[in-house]
Amino acid sequence: MSLLLLVVSALHILILVLLFVATLDKSWWTLPEKESLNLWYDCTWNTTAKTWACSNVSENGWLKAVQALMVLSLILCCLSFILFMIQLYTMRRGGLFYATGLCQLCTSAAVFSGALIYAIHAKEILAKHPSGGSFGYCFALAWVAFPLALVSGIIYIHLRKRE
């Protein structure tokens, strides 16, 4: 049982790290010339000063939805980890981790929705930027976090507390 708890906790922490990096780092979209766009700032690489020059992102409604969903996924994932720890120490033997599992499933749905909106509406979100480029690693991390959170939620729902 302790190995299972260790694996489930490690999976949850991995999902949290993936979500933090995906939400806060600066590479949801990469353009030629080392320009990097994220959910919060548009950053360009200044070759003479060798620094990043960043400005606020557009006021696009779809981007605001992606921002809100990614922040919501982080909050839900943190909440589900806290719930798991509380349930682990207060729940009676034989109980199921329904609340934790439901929270993780909602995390998965929020990440899925945010990444899907960004993928579908990328042209609208990036309208003021030159064409070309590709999705960055933060976008990929969000898609990796989605199935992991889904599997984690299912595991929590089926997990019983034992001694």
Swiss-Prot record:
User: Any idea where this protein resides?
Assistant: Membrane
Question: How is this protein named in the record?
Answer: Epithelial membrane protein 3
Membrane topology label:
Multi-pass membrane protein
A GO CC annotation recorded here is: plasma membrane
Q: Which residues cross the membrane?
A: 4-24, 66-86, 100-120, 139-159
The UniProt similarity line reads: Belongs to the PMP-22/EMP/MP20 family.
Q: Which residues are glycosylated?
A: 46, 56
**Role summary:** Probably involved in cell proliferation and cell-cell interactions.
What is the native source organism of this protein? Answer: Rattus norvegicus
Instruction: Give the record's keywords alphabetically.
Output: Glycoprotein, Membrane, Transmembrane, Transmembrane helix
Q: Which domain of life is it from?
A: Eukaryota
Question: Which PANTHER family has this protein been placed in?
Answer: EPITHELIAL MEMBRANE PROTEIN 3 (PTHR10671:SF8), EPITHELIAL MEMBRANE PROTEIN-RELATED (PTHR10671)
Its GO biological process terms? apoptotic process; bleb assembly
Q: Which Pfam families match?
A: PMP22_Claudin (PF00822)
**Which InterPro entries did the record assign?**
EMP_3 (IPR003934), PMP-22/EMP/MP20-like (IPR050579), PMP22/EMP/MP20/Claudin (IPR004031), PMP22_EMP_MP20 (IPR004032)
